[in-house]
Amino acid sequence: MKKAAIITVGSELLEGLILNRNAQFLCQELKNLGYRVIKVSTVGDHLEDIAEEVRSLLPEVHLLILTGGLGPTKDDLTREAVAKALNRKLLLDYNLKTKIEEKVKKYHSKIPSNIEKQALVIEGAKVIDNPVGSAPGQLLEVDGKKVILLPGPPKELIPMFESLKELLKTPHAFYQVVLKYYSIPEAVLEDLLKEILYSQDRVEVATMADHVEGVRLRLTTSAEHREFLDELVEKILEKTGEYLYGMNDEKMEEVVVRLLKENKKTLAVAESCTGGMLSSLVVNVPGASDVFIGGVVAYSNELKKSILGVKEDTLRKYGAVSEQCVQEMTEGLKKLTEADICVAISGIAGPSGGTPTKPVGTVFIDLFEQNHSTVRYNFSGDRNTIRTRSAMMALENLRKHLKERGRS
């Protein structure tokens, strides 16, 4: 198996100011392409430090990827450092300079004088087009090895790396399927599947869990065992299909919007503790406007009464965090928006506000189409975790409701 290494450049990474998402993305992608990543290092914006890391790692690997440091400013030094490490010249590419200037003109009336720096190309390098930003990447061949320079922003790096995947693929490329679940605990899922998963040795199994994507079951095998993996997935879905919400890169909100379209249903939401988080997740999906009418953030009791028609008597008897309150929220929302399906969330996200009968993490979610479906949850975690889990569980309830509707 070919070896690879990654150098992420940027003092902001060493200072903990931003997360190193590029390393995570590249490690996953390189494994699937058949590489063994032997090292990921982070280097600050210092020319000699970057050059020394290149000199140190290149003899050990078949592929070396550097990210960051390709901008136009004084501390963007990756081009210069790689050129120095390889003892190659930096050459100004006038055609590239013109292309970069044309891109910059679309967003700025004046072209910065330092933009020329981004048109410096290491001797012998092939330019990698950046479809999103102004900083092009570079690809070099060095004694049969590949050295790739990519910009730091993930929104630029990811599409540029995607354009290189065919070039980088090895005979040892992996085939991977990720199955995503939300309303089933990781331990329960593994127990359901242990006989299927662990009675074979051709597929590597890994489970991961978080409050955003739920439980992810990652199945990886070599390309030669692809058919076996496909058959294994079929067996898994026979046992756990009712809990599955998506596969691979699918997000819960994308699945819900698709199901709303398939069922020809519209949606409106009323939120209290989530403060618009559920609405935000839905509208992040392209095409959501076809099915999403809108949302109301009714954080105070006054707004719950004046906009959604929640009764004063209900709030006094049962409180804002109650089955009765969320049901009146969805009923009022339905009158207000005439949406086919209405969802309401009200809860105690903390850190204060809990009581013995309704501790922090108590959340009520109601889904109302023709009848109410109300569930009380007791989520753990900090304030943001409770809010996120509430919004995601509302989506999961919607998904299950729409799937059931599609079967009837």
Curated annotation (Swiss-Prot):
Gene3D superfamilies in UniProt:
3.30.70.2860, CinA-like, MoaB/Mog-like domain
User: Which Pfam families does this one have?
Assistant: CinA (PF02464), CinA_KH (PF18146), MoCF_biosynth (PF00994)
Q: Which CDD domains match?
A: cinA
Q: Which cysteines are joined by disulfide bonds?
A: none
Top-level division of the source organism's lineage: Bacteria
Q: Which SUPFAM superfamilies match?
A: CinA-like, Molybdenum cofactor biosynthesis proteins
Name the coiled-coil region(s). Answer: none
Q: Which PANTHER family match?
A: NICOTINAMIDE-NUCLEOTIDE AMIDOHYDROLASE PNCC, NMN AMIDOHYDROLASE-LIKE PROTEIN YFAY
Q: Family membership, please give it.
A: Belongs to the CinA family.
NCBIfam families annotated for this entry? cinA_nterm, molyb_syn, PncC_domain, PRK00549.1
* Record's protein name: CinA-like protein
